[in-house]
């Protein structure tokens, strides 16, 4: 009894609060028990003090302490009727009605009155959705920024096409807030790091020509998408086809009699997802002329770590300069598109797993690089890229995108790192041990020691089926030591295009889980959220709102968080949709199988019924014949049977049987039908009035015994068509027998 007495039960109604609000709203509309008047721009609003004080901190401070029976609160000029009317409806109905005309004023009134339980993100979303005029302002601002940003020293050219140049400039602009690049005259010359004046002059000339030639040709609609999320995706999901950002990269000489050494420099802070270096081997005539003068500047930059300055693992690589051969090619051709480019390969540096390995790997790579760069090179008299058309370029790039999208997976980190691997027993042995996972692109994927992570290592030069007019160009082939120039065989022609990797948003499979999760994690890494993306996805709606209130987040972080959650919801919805479709398909398959089995059973049943029906007809026919033989029927009985018999089976066989049984057939037939008043007619083949037909047949037939077989042959079809009338005949026979 003690347990039952101490037990307490609570009843909680889910509609009580809603009904109370509805009742209060009805009282407000009818001006019942309203004790406060709010004046907004001369317009009066009647309300209840308790409701206003509970919904707004401003009204709570104005109303509490007032003892007047009828209180009037006059709001300042900041509060307008258009902004206050939806708020008072929200206080009584918990519904806030917004439109393009009143969203700004309602937002100002909410901030001024300190209205509770209204999310600020709602206004940000609606402003972002309604106000389309901001896109034009962004275009003007971005145009102004592009003109001044070209003078910065982190030069990002594209040696393939003008659209690649536009993409690189857009990427550079979008990274301006989070990437701080050094100036060319202050930070690039530090300590023992040097840059030669000819190289700086060529770079400055390239930048000037870029700013003057491409200033009017920039397609601002393509560079300025309408929404910020598209801008963010536009700036982060494209791997730049040309960016020199390897950590502390140095250009070393490859000839023993070299007198000068060009060095790339480091020391600047930068953040780049992928560091890409293009190796240009065009304009061989210019290179040969430099060789005759005794100097052979290296067109490549091997990774070399400066002594005494080890880099931490999480440090980002600096932005460097391009190779000298590429700049000479640019100066001599005078074209931003760089028609002399022969090969593009992607090269980045893998993060070092141990601090002591920083001094061992660069020196080993440098020795192997110097050894491989001494190899023979074939001379090429013509540039194959000049014969290439823009259509072939686009086809090759689209094919590359299609192959790359199949390889990217969610298991790999969102910032994929392309790293050259060091050969152990030589380039040939390392090449034989590798496994090509994409035969056309020649992409080889190395297996990382960490479980669940895979990194792209080498993009080898491959045979492009759509570019068949490329001339073979000789260069040293070494896949394992970081040298990305290849010796082409006489039967093979290298494809010089770099693969542009799309990471999710550019692909049409937006509902796929792999691309969406990869893009979400990429944005999470870039915006630097205080919590991971998995937590954003797994939380419920209330917990998610509480989490946002606990942290002070910037608009960029809020956009990223909502984008991640939206993508996760879309992915879950797509998975559920696919599951429903699969369930429907399975149900349809089961129904089809069920209908097929039912059809087979019905066909078998029909065959069985038909066979049974044939047997039954035969049995009834035999039974009727037997009964008619045994019973001597009177003429009246025969007439009754003929009246109820069907047209398909008359009783003529009875007459024939009776005629056969008598010695004088003619007398028997005439005596049977003597009482019939039916006039003689033409003999029908089989039908009603069979008695008259039989009588006429008897009268016309000669009085011989040979007429019986002829009658039997004429009545044979009627005898075979025994149906339901046989059953009626049998029942009539039983009735006459009983009489």
UniProtKB/Swiss-Prot annotation:
Ranges where the record places region Basic motif: 565-581
Domain (bZIP) ranges: 560-623
PTM characteristics: Ubiquitinated by the SCF(FBXL17) complex or by the by the SCF(FBXO22) complex, leading to its degradation by the proteasome. Under oxidative stress, reactive oxygen species covalently modify cysteine residues on the bZIP domain of BACH1 and release it from chromatin. If the BTB domain of BACH1 remains intact, its beta1-alpha6 degron is recognized by FBXO22, promoting its ubiquitination and degradation.
Record-linked InterPro entries: BTB/POZ_dom, bZIP, bZIP_BACH, bZIP_Maf, bZIP_sf, SKP1/BTB/POZ_sf, TF_DNA-bd_sf, ZnFinger_BTB_dom_contain
Key word Transcription regulation present: yes
Region (Disordered): 287-321, 344-391, 679-708
UniProt feature, compositional bias: Basic and acidic residues: 346-364, 376-391
Domain of life, source organism: Eukaryota
Primary site of residence: nucleus
Entries under Pfam families matching the protein: BTB, bZIP_Maf
Entries under Gene3D superfamilies matching the protein: Potassium Channel Kv1.1, Chain A (3.30.710.10), Transcription factor, Skn-1-like, DNA-binding domain (1.10.880.10)
Ranges of Low complexity composition bias in the record: 699-708
Stretches for region Leucine-zipper: 585-592
Matching SMART domains: BRLZ, BTB
Cellular component GO terms, alphabetical: nucleus; RNA polymerase II transcription regulator complex
Function statement: Transcriptional regulator that acts as a repressor or activator, depending on the context. Binds to NF-E2 DNA binding sites. Plays important roles in coordinating transcription activation and repression by MAFK. Together with MAF, represses the transcription of genes under the control of the NFE2L2 oxidative stress pathway.
Stated name of the protein: Transcription regulator protein BACH1
Taxon lineage: Eukaryota, Metazoa, Chordata, Craniata, Vertebrata
The encoding gene: Bach1
């Amino acid at each position: 009894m003690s347990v039952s007495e101490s037990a307490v039960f609570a009843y909680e109604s889910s509609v009580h609060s809603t009904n109370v609000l509805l009742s209060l709203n009805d009282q407000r509309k009818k001006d019942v028990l309203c004790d406060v008047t709010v004046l907004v721009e001369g317009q009066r609003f009647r309300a209840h003090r308790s409701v206003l004080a509970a919904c707004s901190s401003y009204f709570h401070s104005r109303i509490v302490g007032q003892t007047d029976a009828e209180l009037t609160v006059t709001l300042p000029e900041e509060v307008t009727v258009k902004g206050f009317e939806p708020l008072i409806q929200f206080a009584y109905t918990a519904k806030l009605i917004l439109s393009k005309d009143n969203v700004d004023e309602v937002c100002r009134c909410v901030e001024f009155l300190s209205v509770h339980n209204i999310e600020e993100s709602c206004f940000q979303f609606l402003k972002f959705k309604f106000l389309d005029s901001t896109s034009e302002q962004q275009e003007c601002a971005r145009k102004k920024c592009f003109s001044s940003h070209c003078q910065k020293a982190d030069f990002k050219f594209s040696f393939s096409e003008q659209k690649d140049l536009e993409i690189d400039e857009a990427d550079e602009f979008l990274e301006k807030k989070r990437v701080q690049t050094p100036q060319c005259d202050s930070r690039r010359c530090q300590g023992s790091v040097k840059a030669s004046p000819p190289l700086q002059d060529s770079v400055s000339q390239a930048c000037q020509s870029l700013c003057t030639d491409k200033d009017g040709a920039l397609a601002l609609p393509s560079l300025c998408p309408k929404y910020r999320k598209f801008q963010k995706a536009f700036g982060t999901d494209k791997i730049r086809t040309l960016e020199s950002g390897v950590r502390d990269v140095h250009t070393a000489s490859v000839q023993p009699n070299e007198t000068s050494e060009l060095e790339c420099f480091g020391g600047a802070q930068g953040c780049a997802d992928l560091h890409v270096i293009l190796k240009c081997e065009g304009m061989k005539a210019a290179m040969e002329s430099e060789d005759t003068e005794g100097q052979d500047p290296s067109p490549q930059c091997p990774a070399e770590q400066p002594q005494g300055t080890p880099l931490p693992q999480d440090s980002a690589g600096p932005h460097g300069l391009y190779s000298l051969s590429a700049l000479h090619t640019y100066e001599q051709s005078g074209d931003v598109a760089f028609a002399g480019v022969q090969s593009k390969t992607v090269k980045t540096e893998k993060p070092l797993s141990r601090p002591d390995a920083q001094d061992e790997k660069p020196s080993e790579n440098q020795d192997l690089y110097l050894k491989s760069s001494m190899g023979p090179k074939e001379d090429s008299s013509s540039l194959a890229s000049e014969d290439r058309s823009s259509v072939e370029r686009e086809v090759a790039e689209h094919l590359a995108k299609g192959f790359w999208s199949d390889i990217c997976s969610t298991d790999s980190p969102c910032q994929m790192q392309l790293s050259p691997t060091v050969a152990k027993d030589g380039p040939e042995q390392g090449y034989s041990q590798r496994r090509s996972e994409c035969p056309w692109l020649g992409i080889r994927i190395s297996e990382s020691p960490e479980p669940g992570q895979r990194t792209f290592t080498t993009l080898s030069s491959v045979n492009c089926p759509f570019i068949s007019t490329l001339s073979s160009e000789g260069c040293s082939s070494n896949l394992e030591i970081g040298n990305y120039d290849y010796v082409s065989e006489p039967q093979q022609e290298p494809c010089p295009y770099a693969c542009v990797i799309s990471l999710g948003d550019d692909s049409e499979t937006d509902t796929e889980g792999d691309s969406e999760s990869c893009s979400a994690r990429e944005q999470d890494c870039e915006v630097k959220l205080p919590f991971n993306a998995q937590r954003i996805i797994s939380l419920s709606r209330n917990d998610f709102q509480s989490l946002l209130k606990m942290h002070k987040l910037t608009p960029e972080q809020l956009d990223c968080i909502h984008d991640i959650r939206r993508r996760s919801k879309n992915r879950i919805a797509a998975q559920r949709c696919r599951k429903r479709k699969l369930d429907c398909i399975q149900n349809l398959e089961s129904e089809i199988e069920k209908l097929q089995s039912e059809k087979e059973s019905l066909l078998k049943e029909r065959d069985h019924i038909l066979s049974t029906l044939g047997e039954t007809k035969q049995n009834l026919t035999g039974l009727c014949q037997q009964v008619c033989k045994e019973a001597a029927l009177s003429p009246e009985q025969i007439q009754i049977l003929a009246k109820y018999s069907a047209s398909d089976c008359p009783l003529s066989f009875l007459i024939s049987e009776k005629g056969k049984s008598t010695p004088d057939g003619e007398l028997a037939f005439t005596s049977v039908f003597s009482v019939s008043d039916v006039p003689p007619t033409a003999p029908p083949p089989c039908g009603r009035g069979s008695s008259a037909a039989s009588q006429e047949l008897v009268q016309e037939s000669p009085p011989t015994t040979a007429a019986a077989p002829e009658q039997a042959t004429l009545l044979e079809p009627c005898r075979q068509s025994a149906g339901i009338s046989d059953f009626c005949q049998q029942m009539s026979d039983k009735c006459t027998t009983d009489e």
